[in-house]
Amino acid sequence: MKKRFLSAIMLAASFAVALADNPPLMGWSSWNTYGFQINDSVIKAQADAMATLGFKDCGYNHINIDDGFFGGRDGNGKLLIHPVRFPDGLRPVVDYIHSLGLRAGIYSDAGRNTCASYWGEPKDTIGIGTGLYGHDAEDMALFFNELAFDFIKVDYCGADANNNAEALDLDVEQRYKEIAAAIKATGRDDVTWNICRWAFPGTWACEIADSWRTTEDIYLAWESVKSIINQSLYLSAYASPGHYNDMDMLEVGRGLTEEEDKTHFGMWCMMSSPLLIGCDLNDIKGDALELMQNRELIAVDQDPLGLQAYVVKSENGGHVLVKDVEEKYGTKRVVAFYNPTNSALSMSVDFSQLDLVGDVAVRDLFEKADKGVYNGTLSVNVPAHGTRI
């Protein structure tokens, strides 16, 4: 009988994968490690690391500046750049990023104030009044025409009555559609953008944005990673080529256990989430560099179908998820055995649940090794907090 393959794309010595026209974003973002304590040297150092440590060759191509670059507004309302953190402004930083063959990303808020101006200690109070509200057209022209950024993340702290001192309470859908119109008005058709509303915003987001946050902010703890995965298990209907559920920036390489790092990265890839590294690229802990440069897992994330994995079986606290790759309803599947519990699990799936029949060739994507040919059922042992793909 003809073999049907349960695997990711079978990769040759060189990495080649057909990408969707607008695959999930890959790159690095400043917030997880630096918060608002950023400057031009920090950003350039991360760009250098991305270009020289193998990340660019694996498809990572964005350097994103999150909150912390703001310097208030002048008397005419023009947005200013922080004079100490970026003494020469942002355009030289963007030009430097571009000179390395990378794309540059920036941050703003849908309301009047940024998140760092309200949350955390100490607060970055210079972010007060620097949000987009009342300045959509001029700020987008600044970011995309004058400063030549390629991506923007738009937060919502300053537009939610629960998260800003002014109790400004804007209509989420209307507000983000106004922002989408302002981006379009710049004339740039190569700009991508992210809605950051900390929960799935609604199907309207799928029509206007490239990605949208579906959960609260990630933080450096297994409980955070587990919570985000749990909230993402049943959102596959809302992902499509060019439009993705964003599970937030990666905490891989910052101190989770090896199994937790593998689950974190692997499940983000299964879900076709943007892959934005959050650690210092020059100080990656453990085996995380090799993990984040696993081209077989990256191929799963960047697969041209742009689909998100969905649950086919749940048992004893674990979940089995499947994802079509290369061809919808074809002969390849990527399957994740996800164990969020505190004990090891023996997990299995019948090939009939994956719409596969006959002999099935199996490959382990973490090990990057063929595991043989199976028929009927695949069983694996998965450690606590672990995943096998």
Segment roles from a protein language model:
Residues 138, 189-280:
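Glycan-recognition surfaces
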Residues 263-312, 388-389:
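Catalytic cores of secreted or luminal carbohydrate-active enzymes
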Residues 268-271, 276-278, 314-356:
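Carbohydrate-binding surface patches
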